[in-house]
Regions:
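Conserved acidic carboxylate
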Residues: 9
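Two-component/phosphorelay signaling modules centered on CheY-like receiver
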Residues: 12-30
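As written
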Residues: 25, 47, 61, 70, ...
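Residue-level signal for the "D+5" position in two-component response regulator receiver
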Residues: 31, 56-59, 88, 96
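Acidic catalytic/metal-coordinating carboxylates
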Residues: 34-37, 60-66
């Protein structure tokens, strides 16, 4: 069975682009449009990986990541945070929240993703 990914992204355009990349490397993807929906989905059906946008309505990606990392169901699920920002401050906040990796959206590509997924043990 293909590894499962929960993508938490509020932009439908971005979600489609990212989903296409993830599916192109053989992953099964479900999409949540905001933080509360993403948390609910992750707790009900823990995925193999969570790809999480930082800028979300109602609660930001850092808050979502912290909640997921505190829950028994998802504490060991790798989280890759996505953002338009590339500053050190944002990276440190994301890692402190529990993210396993941090990828700027402008370099989100299949090759980089494959490398990260192998490092996290999601793909062989």
């Amino acid at each position: 069975m293909a590894p499962t990914v929960l993508l938490i992204e509020d932009s439908q355009t971005q979600a489609k682009q990212i989903r296409d990349v993830l599916e192109s490397v053989g992953l099964t993807v479900s999409v949540a449009n905001d933080g509360p929906e993403g948390i609910r989905e992750a707790l009900e059906n823990p995925p193999d990986l969570i790809v999480l946008d930082i800028k979300l309505p109602s609660m930001d990606g850092y808050q979502v990541c912290r909640r997921l990392k505190r829950a028994d169901e998802t504490k060991d699920v790798p989280v890759i945070m996505l953002t338009d920002k590339t500053g050190t401050k944002e990276t440190m906040i994301g890692l402190k929240a529990g993210a396993d990796d941090y990828i700027p959206k402008d370099i989100f590509a299949a090759e980089h993703l494959m490398e990260t997924l192998r490092e996290l043990g999601v793909l062989d």
